[in-house]
From Swiss-Prot:
Domain Acylphosphatase-like: 14-100
Organism, scientific name: Nocardia farcinica (strain IFM 10152)
Any GO MF annotation of the entry: acylphosphatase activity
Keyword check for Metal-binding: no
Known catalytic reactions: an acyl phosphate + H2O = a carboxylate + phosphate + H(+)
KW Hydrolase (keyword) present: yes
Pfam families: Acylphosphatase
NCBIfam families in the record: PRK14422.1
Name of the protein described by the UniProt record: Acylphosphatase
Annotated active site: 29, 47
Family named by the database record: Belongs to the acylphosphatase family.
Length: 100
């Protein structure tokens, strides 16, 4: 995780997480959407042509970090082998949380 002096606990952030493994066709995007909505996050989970799922989530850093922990928890549908994350300031261009 990269942090800058401008990161503050209450400032919204944007999490981009590429989820590798057996994560398509197993209810993974639905599960991710449910966890994100429970946390009050906005964003989406989208299947990639190469078999990964791309998760974008915006909200308070603590809530995004919790979603990231859940993605890595081993309790997801399917089988997650790797999650590659990146962080940036929230763009504020998302509403709700969608499966795409």
């Amino acid at each position: 995780m990269s942090e800058s002096p401008h990161d503050h606990a209450g400032d919204p952030v944007r999490l981009s997480a590429w989820v590798h493994g057996h994560v398509q066709g197993v209810g993974f995007r639905w599960w991710t959407r449910s966890r994100a909505l429970e946390s009050g996050l906005t964003g989406y989970a989208r299947n990639a042509p190469d078999g990964r799922v791309h998760v974008i989530a915006e909200g308070p850093r603590e809530r995004c970090e919790r979603l990231l922990e859940l993605l890595r928890s081993g309790t997801t549908p399917g089988r997650v082998s790797l999650v590659v994350e990146s962080w940036e300031p929230a763009r504020g261009d998302l509403t709700g949380f969608e499966e795409r």
